Amino acid sequence: MSGTGRQFRVARAVISPQHPGMIRDKEKPAPTKPGKGVIAVAPPSFRRERALLKRGVWPVAGCDEAGRGPLAGPVVAAAVVLDPKRIPKGLDDSKRLTADKREQLFEQICATAAFAVAYASPARIDRDNILRASLWALAKAVHALPEMPRHVFVDGRDKIATSCDCDAVIGGDGLVLSIAAASIIAKVSRDRLMCRLAEDCPGYGFENHKGYGVPEHLAALDRLGPSKHHRRLFAPVVAARQKHQPETATVPAVAADLFEFGAPPV
């Protein structure tokens, strides 16, 4: 949302002429109450999935990732196929939910939907760059589903390499219910994993900031230097590495990845 004070709501989806595989939502000003600067945001819907189901196209998956921005830990991607008859209530973009609500919905999604999780390790991120590593993990998650979907909706601007049809939806975690479910699975899986990494590498506060570059984390990096779970080519990590390890260190090979794909942490 811009800082101009105008509020928007989704009107309808259109195909972006610049990127035919990408769906962009046309927007129009939404009414606001006088003197109010915040309005309720409509939750994601199941209409795209339902439209495909009516045409006989099923399974339909949504996929999303968590952890592009942190300085440490993997990118975690999830793919979810919701059961149209057992959709958990309250699904939304994981960023709009409290941690407790995410945990609650995580368990409900796992109990009612088909899902898969994939991990792109810091070593892969350093080798391939964060975007390519994220797209790789998203594709791995889709192909790890119990049944290959016939159509996939992915959050963002970029389609992923799959053997089925794929649409990229900008802001998809707030628009498409299956993507919202995937955002919850990815976020909770990654948060749980970072708490485990905090036990493996104490002192960095991974359990608190989940690897993001907050002051607590930057101070620990400066004090302790990078851990084996840090992304060695991210600028703050490079600076800390130069301070603690002045010699040039090689980037670990992808073959040594700690995480590839599998069940989410418990």
UniProtKB/Swiss-Prot annotation:
Signal peptide: none annotated. GO terms for cellular component: cytoplasm; ribonuclease H2 complex. Residues 19-38 are annotated as: Disordered. The keyword Oxidoreductase does not apply. Keywords: Cytoplasm, Endonuclease, Hydrolase, Manganese, Metal-binding, Nuclease. Manganese or magnesium. Binds 1 divalent metal ion per monomer in the absence of substrate. May bind a second metal ion after substrate binding. Its cofactor is Mn(2+); Mg(2+). A divalent metal cation binds at D64, E65, D155. It is found in: Cytoplasm. Residues 58-246 form the RNase H type-2 domain. GO terms for biological process: DNA replication, removal of RNA primer; mismatch repair. Its EC number is 3.1.26.4. It comes from the Bacteria. CDD domains: RNase_HII_bacteria_HII_like. It catalyses: Endonucleolytic cleavage to 5'-phosphomonoester. Gene3D superfamilies: Ribonuclease H-like superfamily/Ribonuclease H. GO terms for molecular function: manganese ion binding; RNA binding; RNA-DNA hybrid ribonuclease activity. Belongs to the RNase HII family. Endonuclease that specifically degrades the RNA of RNA-DNA hybrids. This is Ribonuclease HII. The gene is rnhB.
